[in-house]
Amino acid sequence: MQTHTRLLDELCHLTAQSLASLETSDHFQIIKLLGEGSYGKVMLAMHKKRGTPMALKFFQRDSTCLLSFLREYNLSLAFCTHPSLTSALGIAFSTPTHYVFAQQPCIYGDLYDVIIPEVGMEENRVQQVASQISGALTHLHSLGFVHRDVKPENIFLCDRDCRWVKLGDFGMAKAVGTRVQCIWYSSPYCTPESKIARVTKKIDSGCFEVNNNGNKEKVHGEKPEKMYCTVDPSTDSWALGILVYAMLTGNHPWSETVSDNVAYKRYLQWRKWGISVSEKIWSHQEPSRFMKFTPLAASLFRSLLHPQPKCRGRPEEMGEFLGGAWLMDQKKV
């Protein structure tokens, strides 16, 4: 794994030395917008000389660190050889306003647009996607990298029926074991171990800090403390579990992964006691959102959504859960 991270660093160094400055319109015919986000945008384009269709990913220079751009490009170019990972095409350049690299085009949009709210997707399609994304994550993990941002918006379609999908957007990807700032955010995709980032540290009122004007001022009250955690593949396992739930139901299992969230608390009880006991627990309450699943799917969720990262299931185990029914017959629920 360390060999792969060293190779990535070397590739970034070499690319930085050879990164050309080009005018996009001189070499590419822009066809249409494929997507956009906080980083910039992705455009479908045609290479004028080769006649090759490709997706050009534009990163705004004023808000993008060059090293971050180089790492995403080279990770996609050198390591994303799995058929369900988007691969770069060996073209990277800069313009006065953007850093740009070319990648395989996925012209049918992303998975977010396929999932019908409150309904989800057909179960066979869900299993198709789950199989492909688990394979993509297994490949990344075997090389020592963690995606860290698995969600429907980052899964791209190569056809309308989800027979072939690709996991993309490696801007958050890091090597296993890297120390990063732990960030908690209000989302089911946020892992339970990220709750440490909500902790605040009391600052002694006698301390001083430098304000925006460069002057020292006394600090009072509480100040958030930066917390750090180690990058681990279990983060992707958790996201994979939430993704499967979203595809099956068109909903999220809970709004945020915190112990005082009612839906998450009920999940923990359901996970601990099982379906039969859950029926008694919720006989006079809203039933668990996980009681609609077959025992096979229930086992999958218990594995991927284990609250303890060391006990969490791995993407390569997905094959054990494929082929059987995941949703109960609604007439029997």
Q: Model-flagged regions — what are they?
A:
Residues S87-Y99:
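Short beta-strand micro-motifs within the conserved protein kinase catalytic domain, predominantly
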Residues K41:
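Conserved N-lobe ATP-binding subsite of Hanks-type protein kinase domains
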Residues M1-E23, I31:
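Juxta-kinase regulatory segment immediately upstream of eukaryotic protein kinase catalytic domains
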Residues V129-A130:
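Activation segment signature within eukaryotic-like protein kinase domains
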Residues C158-C207:
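Activation segment/activation loop of eukaryotic-type protein kinase catalytic domains
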Residues H141-C158:
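Catalytic-loop of the protein kinase fold
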